[in-house]
Amino acid sequence: MLSFIIKRILWAIPTLFGVSIIVFMMVHLVPGDPALVILGEKANQAAIDALREQFGLNKPLIEQYFFFINNVLHGNFGTSIMTGEPVMHEFWQRFPATVELALIALFMALVLGISVGVLAAIKRYSVFDYSSMTFALAGISMPVFWLGLMLIYIFSVQLEWLPVFGRLSDVYYLDGPTGLYLIDSLIARDYGAFVDTIKHLILPSIVLATVSTAVIARMTRASMAEVSKEDYVRTAKAKGCSSFRVIFVHTLRNALIPVTTIAGLMLAGLLGGSMITETVFSWPGIGKWIVNALNQRDFPIIQSMSLIIAMMYIGANLLVDILYAFIDPRIRLS
């Protein structure tokens, strides 16, 4: 197991190196000068040159790249051009908001998606099967921004049941150790803030979970249908095992292997920040932060976050491979 993990980490190094080159070139090929974005079109040339000198934007691209890589290897991801704050300082300020939203959304997607997929597989070719898979297809096809705007219009504007944006109402203040408001509000015993946090989480988490739920439901159904044809499932039925044991012990456990793969990648994507959802709901996470950085040509943030998100995907893949061994003992990581 340890040798497998070490090999995967070593293989990740050239992957990250390739990602860094591609992202660096793409960022610098995009039209626009960060100095002009910050100072405005009417800024004098001396001020523009001074700002470009401050952030090293006047140096050759190859020199800028190796300067960036050298800093990353020393744990320095640079300084934001717009705010002057260290990139990692701003990242850790926003990451808890994204983590909280991502975990809630993934939990909802796994519970609903697997449940619907299992029921659809059990009641194959029934009305429930056709209707649930139709809704799943609609969920995959539905534009995220449209769904977010519709939920805001119905539940926030018309019914006034839920807040429109943000993580917490202005009447509450939390400064806990985790940055996760659900946990920090319980630590502080501020139950009003806890309820308010849940209200703020409902709409964005539903939007974020919709596509994931649909994908997991369809994959669970397909995997269950395939596994149910295996010899060991037929043997379990022939031995007189109960339907519950056949479904949840022999069929579902093996059907979860492809679901685990997609769930791991979903988690990495959600932790990387859902840009559209966070922007629609003004959620103060890293997704909205990256969108702002793209609009403002903030190269250090874009480059650093691309590397960090790539690390998340590599870590998620490694975690999924390790989980395989627990789900199916026949799999040998070595």
Annotate the PLM regions:
Residues 6-16:
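N-terminal signal-anchor/signal peptide hydrophobic helix marking the start
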Residues 30, 139-142, 271:
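Transmembrane helix irregularities
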